[in-house]
Amino acid sequence: MRLWKARVLKLVLKTAKDSRLGLNSKWLSLKLGDAGNPRSLAIRFILTNYNKLSIQSWFSLRRVEIISNNSIQAVFNPTGVYAPSGYSYRCQRVGSLQQDQALLLPSDTDDGSSLWEVTFIDFQIQGFAIKGGRFTKAQDCASSFSPAFLIGLAMSLILLLVLAYALHMLIYLRYLDQQYDLIASPAHFSQLKARDTAEEKELLRSQGAECYKLRSQQISKIYV
């Protein structure tokens, strides 16, 4: 397996036209090593301009080719590498590895693409609306909902739920502690004793009234 990493300079590459790509496509070529040597390694980025919305045109990286000895050695199909046509695309890491979010997928053809592992660090590219040979405002890949972003969001929500549950339990335990202190206090016992005494007096008073009522209802019998 060939492992290849490159720190791409933030420069707008020269544009070459190819009739096979169509009117809305361009390819940018980056050569490593001696530019005049046909055996030197070259990377070709094929970009396509399209209208995602009626009021805004976008460009996307459609294909990445690794060329050596004037022949294509590997082909990768990018996913999620796009930006408005008036912007450049920028990402900290773009590659074929899972740690790079697998933005470069090896081609399905049997050309040995799966044997290559490619990673671009500090990657930035723009193929349209170039002014003065400089990048325009960049759209970062971090703004999209990447798997790492979604995992971080899910972990944050789980942590928030755990903290909310812990706070609820803390408040409940504090309430139980206050109730226990209230029950165990001498004032509470004196109140209970006074209430029990009052209930006993009320019970005795009601029993005496019932006895008097029964005596008053006795009937006298006279025999002649």
From Swiss-Prot:
Which InterPro entries is this protein grouped with? Ac45_acc_su, VAS1/VOA1_TM, VAS1_LD
Q: Which cellular component terms (GO) are annotated to the entry? A: membrane
Q: Which Gene3D superfamilies match?
A: 2.40.160.110
Q: Which UniProt keywords apply?
A: Membrane, Transmembrane, Transmembrane helix
Q: Where in the cell is it found?
A: Membrane
User: What gene does the UniProt entry assign to this protein?
Assistant: ATP6AP1L
- Protein origin, superkingdom: Eukaryota
PANTHER family from the UniProt entry = ATPASE, H+ TRANSPORTING, LYSOSOMAL ACCESSORY PROTEIN 1-LIKE, VACUOLAR ATP SYNTHASE SUBUNIT S1
Q: Which family does it belong to?
A: Belongs to the vacuolar ATPase subunit S1 family.
UniProt cross-references to Pfam families, sorted A to Z: Ac45-VOA1_TM, VAS1_LD
Entry membrane topology: Single-pass membrane protein
On whether Transmembrane helix is a keyword of this UniProt record, the answer is yes
TM stretches of this protein: 147-167
Q: What's this protein's name? A: V-type proton ATPase subunit S1-like protein
Q: Which organism is it from?
A: Homo sapiens (Human)
